[in-house]
């Protein structure tokens, strides 16, 4: 019985502890004799419980089932309704309830007042500022904590200390909640006015954050940090996270580098034993002291003290505590403001006439030139993507909101929807579709707004622009991004790199004669001063490009793009404020355009270049690197003398002065040893990531179900754990138990077992062992996987009805006709499937599929259907391979130094033995020749799944496929007849398998799979010339060895003698692997 199942049965007896409660375990087996006993056992249990008899004698009688079969689920039956939480909570509510300081925040509603003081009536009330937006309730969270506390009340020694720390913190939470009563949620897990009116408005979200924090306490330091954040975040709902995390931008500049990793010419990390001294002018210490004083003013005591104590010797060993504080600060929850404040925040900036026009001019010209450089080649060559930009835009049209709800008719069905894709279909059907006209967003048609909430920052607004903007920008932006892909300055987009590569880039040029300048430009991006020069630079670039081509289609594409920029220079937004919708002229850049990321990166690059060109007037230096990454930019400058305190101070002040000449509200810092940007920070020559993902509060409500959210919760827990913030695993498992249970009736619930939730089926939620993805190969595992596959795809009546309507069919046909030179069923079907999949984001379709899936699941969890599926999964392949491997003990010494101090020990150990990788493994098939050939002639982008299907077809069919996509018949013929085609077969299979094995997710993305140290543990005699088989055997061996090392901290070596006769069988099987989509895989993808 795994740990999960043990916790499950204990949890059930904890929650349903009355006389009437019954828990019936349900078992299954792939062995038909044992399966009969399982069914018998279940029937007798149900019968006994109906008659109120004890189940104990049955457990004795059916010992064979309990010992040899696999637990499928537990059926729980209880009359008791939930007032159990309140009853149990009283026992912990022994402390003094917190009192909110009602003057802690500048904006009135951010103070934690009693709800009825903020909202006089139910009509006025909104939960949007405190909605935890997660499909689990405060009462469940309280239950999970009390379950953990009860389970550990008898712990001894060090574990008892953890128990006491958490108990003490929970007493604060329990006492405060108990004073007002536990807020009851409705069926959508929202908290209504009636429930909240006599309680503090932020009680729920505060309690969720506090529970998340207290369940992450292990050491005494954790306890002090958590206590302070829990108590202060009850009152300070606005600036706490920002105050606590501000010092980090300076702390990274204080630690000497003594040995670090740098990126070498081969783009690998290599150790360098260089020593770089941290040179810190007094001014910087004064700024830091001011930050610490601000923390104290806000009532913080222990956290500023810890920072102050660390400052005495600034050691790298003790820096982990600083990085811990930095991560913890985000767990106070999201800062959710009213839209009106979020919007006005950007409009409050004072305009001054006193700006350096020359610098603005240079900035605009740099943007212009960069745009030209990015698009010059595709424009001069009349690139087909720019010619067919409209089609490309339609093919990748998202199903996000189009800003207004419309009544749409699909066949006989009339629906209301805001989705872009549906609006496009409807407009085409009614002749309203005019992609050549970009609708204005002026005072007559103001832009509706979305929001982005993030801990420690103000709420930001997002434009929800009409779909015409997307179509106009899509193709051009794709070309900009493909340029950025091979330009190192764009750290975020640079080809398959990951953050480790960017880390090595910075450390590479740090030395006694260089300094690094790093700037956070998030304020600048959304400031009013940016908008005119920014849009004008883009417009000027587009004008220059228009003169480089004679193709009217390319000119049209560029003109439409230009029109979007012109329209957005005169933009108005609509903001709901109470019952009125205000129209406000909005003169700043906001996210929501397709170009947001690319254009911001271009602008930030232009900005830092402008600044550096001014600095160069005064100092003589060489710019070693310039990088932009999202809202941040940084540059390493190399001087011809050693850097002194005075130099650092002068450069720092000059840079700030230059920014102020542009009236840019940015935070610019200069250091000799480290940087801090939003995504990562480098200190003491090591790389750190902020572990700030909230677990029990979400930013917004999407259409994911409880199962999906349980998988996301687990995935967030894993990411935090890799980054150095660990939450108690038992608590996470308890949350998964709660969130994956399925109600049958009011008093009857079904709880799936570990096997159901960890087997890679369409229902997978978590891994039984953190960081290790297992692919079950035992009979019972394969049996249950097959059973689940039989019910994986669910029909939706609404979706079918929409898809069979003329409107939908015409749209798909329009796309196919525009795309294809000749009919091709694979592509047409692909388009129809993609378009139909987009309907999933329309709630009724989603709910319908979900209901069908839940009812199928309910049937399955009570008795699995034996099902002979002809589908082959990756498990089948691994199952065929496994028997031919022989394991023996091995030894790998630790040979690499640590560069990511926050990693858990077992993961750190593996990296220190086999090394890390600085690249993403290509798992999309885009590196294959066939993919390149298609993109040369067509705007269609086949998925890895489609390529995998196509490449295994007969040669003639591949040729037809290519020709139908516009590849000239002669090229298609050459391709199929060449050796490239057989290499492609291998490449695509490789990508597909990597994709299935999630090799770029979790902690696998950190390991060097091509490490020679790893290779030498594997011995596979070379038998035939089937590279695909050799590949899968090696990959399986590597995963086995790495998983063993993570789990046991020791190494094994594998020998495989794979019979030649089996190879060809395996090879054939490998062309029929089915991909499984599960909440687990979507959660991984969601992390991206």
Swiss-Prot record:
Catalyses which reaction(s): RNA(n) + a ribonucleoside 5'-triphosphate = RNA(n+1) + diphosphate
Enzyme Commission number(s): 2.7.7.48
GO BP term, pick one: viral genome replication
Gene3D superfamilies: 1.10.357.80, 1.20.120.1390, 3.30.230.140, 3.30.70.2480, Viral RNA-directed RNA polymerase, 4-helical domain
Location of the RdRp catalytic domain: 501-687
Major enzyme class: transferase
GO terms of molecular function: nucleotide binding; RNA binding; RNA-directed RNA polymerase activity
Assembly and binders: Interacts with VP3 (Potential). Interacts with VP2; this interaction activates VP1. Interacts with NSP5; this interaction is probably necessary for the formation of functional virus factories. Interacts with NSP2; this interaction is weak.
Function as written in the Swiss-Prot or TrEMBL entry: RNA-directed RNA polymerase that is involved in both transcription and genome replication. Together with VP3 capping enzyme, forms an enzyme complex positioned near the channels situated at each of the five-fold vertices of the core. Following infection, the outermost layer of the virus is lost, leaving a double-layered particle (DLP) made up of the core and VP6 shell. VP1 then catalyzes the transcription of fully conservative plus-strand genomic RNAs that are extruded through the DLP's channels into the cytoplasm where they function as mRNAs for translation of viral proteins.
Name the UniProt record assigns to this protein: RNA-directed RNA polymerase
Organism: Rotavirus A (strain RVA/Human/United States/D/1974/G1P1A[8])
